[in-house]
Amino acid sequence: MAKVIKQQYSFPHPPETVWEYLTKPELMELWLMKNDFQPIVGFDFHFKTNPIPSLNFDGICHCRVLEIVPYKKLSYSWKCGPGAGEITLDTVVEWRLYPTDKGTDLFLEHSGFDKEENLNFYIGMTDGWLKNLEKMAKHLNTAPYGTTNA
């Protein structure tokens, strides 16, 4: 049976602000990974981090932008493996943003963990996404939005 990671986080910011942290490479790097993302459907990009040999992961996630609905939805493929073009994890990440009276509710769904060999990825990434969303919240809440007294 395929496993799906689902996370929800609420931010005291409008969807447009949260969207920037999902689509601007320099902001994505603050809470996720180094990347060459561009918000263009069909665009191929990469996330880069340290290799994890125990998971047969070379540290590179090969991705393609699948869908963009500005300020509402973003999805991309997320593929990785041990290197040399071998892919052992083939998944999809989907972000949905909903405006609220207090800001934005952000929903993450990371699907496609359907192979037994992907169980360790699923376990690690379930915790990893939660930690990354907490990092995003930290950066969003300390970013200089609005006006200052200067």
Protein language model features and the residues they cover:
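Short beta-edge strand/loop motif at the mouth of beta-sheet-based domains
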Residues: 6, 26-60, 149-150
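Short hydrophobic/aromatic-rich beta-strand segments that constitute the beta-sheet cores
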Residues: 45-47, 73-77, 106-108
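A conserved amphipathic terminal alpha-helix motif
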Residues: 112-150
